[in-house]
A protein has these predicted regions:
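Residue-level preference for beta-strand/loop junctions
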Residues: 1-3, 34, 49, 83
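N-terminal first-folded block
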Residues: 3-33
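Short, well-ordered beta-strand segments in beta-rich or mixed alpha/beta enzyme
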Residues: 3-10, 39-67
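An amphipathic, aromatic/His-enriched active-site/gating alpha helix that lines ligand/cofactor pockets
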Residues: 25-38, 56-90
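Short hydrophobic/aromatic patches at helix-to-coil boundaries
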Residues: 91-95
Length: 95
């Protein structure tokens, strides 16, 4: 079953461009190295310093691979330095 994930992310004021660049680097790795990833896109919200990542995975196993990959962990660590708090995650099941 396809799994969707919405991650709402608040970044520190003025750090948006750096966060966007770090996300772009991570997205390239995810799309190249995770065949079970179907979508991994960043959206800038209307609210200042707020982003939403829309992710889709072929199944639970693909989602777990994403959470455990070394490249993913490194990318998340890099982006983490720009965050203003923990992301809010909403998991979705495709109907």
């Amino acid at each position: 079953m396809t799994i969707g994930l919405l991650a709402t992310i608040k970044v520190q004021p003025g750090k948006g461009p750096e966060f966007e660049a770090a996300f772009a680097d991570l997205a390239k790795v995810v799309k190249a190295e995770e065949p079970g990833n179907l979508q991994y896109d960043l959206f800038r919200a209307k609210e200042a310093d707020t982003y939403v990542v829309y992710e889709q995975y072929a199944d639970q196993a693909a989602l777990e691979i994403h959470g455990k990959s070394d490249a993913g962990k490194a990318g998340m660590a890099k982006m983490g330095s720009f965050l203003a708090g923990r992301p809010t995650l909403q998991f979705l099941d495709k109907v």
